[in-house]
């Protein structure tokens, strides 16, 4: 099984997974054109589309793609009116490309946001970003925090396939909170080199995110001291809320979703 990150729009990635038979699925096609180019270049047959939520930059390419291919389109209830023809929810399982995918619930960015997990790949849309998290448009901070806890229960070897290239800005934010953190600083240099070469920083491994992503470190005393915020035991989501507010006002993030 092979994974391809297809750059689209301004900073989106459309994920494509294909097998040796030339069959493939894609996740969150906000634009059909780059997908059609890849399908042609690799001589692949599109069989399924997975949608994590209803925002246009994740679904706008579905209509055109479905005109070229008789695809099954899986998505949460919030995508039904737009394009999904099979509604899925937490606890459902799909067998696609001879692999089993679990449907997970990730409310926060939108209320009905879902993810698809087939080890080692997690397609999480706009929930987890490398070194960051999605903006909260419909849900609550606590819901997004709980979605992160769902992700954190997965294998440390999980490859997080998020939908946007925000890593450098997120690392700049993380570094502003923890300027002496050598792992964050080192990874920031590494990603800078990748991006200067026009290479993606994704997918990212969950084990790495536990180290560089402040939103996975709400329990971390070092982070509490750095931001001068000490939550009561069991109230780590308040740290998450504080971080999300700080991130919303951080310079250079005007394009982040």
Swiss-Prot record:
Q: Which UniProt keywords apply?
A: Hydrolase, Metal-binding, Zinc
Gene Ontology process terms (BP) = methylglyoxal catabolic process to D-lactate via S-lactoyl-glutathione
Give cofactor(s), names only: Zn(2+)
| Binding sites annotated in the UniProt record for Zn(2+) 1 | 53, 55, 109, 126
MF annotations from Gene Ontology: hydroxyacylglutathione hydrolase activity; metal ion binding
Q: Which residues cross the membrane?
A: none
Q: Report which reactions are catalysed by this protein.
A: an S-(2-hydroxyacyl)glutathione + H2O = a 2-hydroxy carboxylate + glutathione + H(+)
Give the EC number(s) listed in the UniProt record: 3.1.2.6
Pathway, according to UniProt?
Secondary metabolite metabolism; methylglyoxal degradation; (R)-lactate from methylglyoxal: step 2/2
Q: So where does Zn(2+) 2 get bound?
A: 57-58, 126, 164
**Note on cofactor:** Binds 2 Zn(2+) ions per subunit.
Against Pfam families, the record matches this protein to: HAGH_C, Lactamase_B
In UniProt terms, what function does this protein have? Thiolesterase that catalyzes the hydrolysis of S-D-lactoyl-glutathione to form glutathione and D-lactic acid.
Q: Return the HAMAP family for the record.
A: Glyoxalase_2
The family annotation for this protein states: Belongs to the metallo-beta-lactamase superfamily. Glyoxalase II family.
Q: What interactions and quaternary structure are annotated?
A: Monomer.
Q: Could you identify this protein by its name?
A: Hydroxyacylglutathione hydrolase
Q: Which organism is it from?
A: Baumannia cicadellinicola subsp. Homalodisca coagulata
